């Protein structure tokens, strides 16, 4: 079985056109971390530049500034690396081109493998990978396996830091480099192999039974986020649902989990 972990950093913003409002991500760094059992891990790192036109930048100026300072520590006007990939000047075309390049690399990495598990940790890359429909691949969000955040992992597991590396593109000391994050998540996956690989082995609980289980847990548990009717609680509610299944040893595939989220309007 081939395991593939993907992480994408870039500038996410709102794009307004004749089709309405669209949330898109213009990539700046992409890391694809992949390995098989009893083999050394391999890493593919891609850098991008361009792709943010003046209108897109102006509309999302405040959001881009926040992302630069607090998330990935890239700047819009930084000089591209010698091996950086130039994106089209039109933002929508840049978005499509970035996705296409990632798809092509994933196809190349996964070809000739009969069993593939594509892993991601939240983020838009999960939707991208699902839309690619890679042959023989199952897509799994690590959040749905109750994998802690990278920040929590490095606080609880100091040995994760000593053996994890980053790249010089980010402010030193930042834990938001995709290379660093993939190394940390790889450590967690190694320690939780049975949970991760179990995704491919266990049959999923049917939708109707999964809903009944969650309804039962809502009625039985005293402290849960569904007691607060607020959109701000949506992510906590999604995490709580996923945690209930994992803690009780119940496997629910991504399609059924998404249907449950939709049932409770957790968009």
Swiss-Prot record:
Entry protein name: Protein I267L
Gene Ontology biological process: symbiont-mediated suppression of host cytoplasmic pattern recognition receptor signaling pathway via inhibition of RIG-I activity
Keywords of the record: Early protein, Host-virus interaction, Inhibition of host innate immune response by virus, Inhibition of host RIG-I by virus, Inhibition of host RLR pathway by virus, Viral immunoevasion
Subunit structure, as described in the record: Interacts with host RNF135.
Transmembrane regions: none
Function: Plays a role in the inhibition of host RNA Pol-III-RIGI-mediated innate antiviral response. Mechanistically, interacts with host E3 ubiquitin ligase RNF135, disrupting RNF135-RIGI interaction and impairing RNF135-mediated 'Lys-63'-polyubiquitination and activation of RIGI.
Induction: Expressed in the early phase of the viral replicative cycle.
Natural source organism: African swine fever virus (strain Badajoz 1971 Vero-adapted) (Ba71V)
Family named by the database record: Belongs to the asfivirus I267L family.
């Amino acid at each position: 079985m081939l395991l593939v972990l993907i992480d994408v950093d870039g500038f996410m913003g709102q794009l307004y056109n004749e089709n309405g409002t669209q949330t898109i991500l213009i990539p700046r760094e992409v890391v694809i971390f992949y390995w098989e059992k009893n083999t050394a891990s391999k890493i593919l790192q891609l850098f991008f530049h361009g792709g943010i036109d003046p209108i897109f930048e102006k509309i999302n100026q405040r959001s881009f500034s926040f992302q630069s300072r607090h998330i990935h520590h890239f700047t819009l006007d930084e000089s591209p690396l010698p091996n950086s990939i130039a994106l089209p000047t039109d933002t929508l075309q840049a978005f499509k081109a970035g996705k296409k390049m990632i798809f092509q690399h994933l196809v190349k990495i996964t070809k000739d493998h009969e069993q593939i598990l594509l892993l991601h940790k939240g983020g838009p890359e999960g939707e991208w990978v699902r839309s690619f429909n890679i042959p023989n691949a199952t897509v799994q969000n690590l959040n749905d396996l109750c994998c802690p955040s990278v920040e929590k992992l490095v606080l609880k597991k100091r040995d994760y830091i000593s053996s994890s590396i980053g790249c010089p593109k980010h402010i030193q000391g930042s834990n938001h480099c995709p290379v660093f994050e993939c190394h940390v998540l790889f450590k967690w996956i190694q320690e939780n192999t049975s949970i991760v690989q179990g995704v491919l082995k266990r049959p999923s609980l049917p939708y109707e039974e999964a809903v009944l289980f969650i309804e039962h847990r809502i009625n039985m548990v005293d402290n849960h986020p569904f007691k607060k009717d607020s959109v701000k609680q949506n992510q906590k509610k999604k995490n709580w649902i996923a945690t209930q299944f994992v803690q009780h040893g119940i496997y629910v595939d991504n399609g059924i989990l998404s249907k449950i989220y939709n049932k409770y309007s957790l968009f």
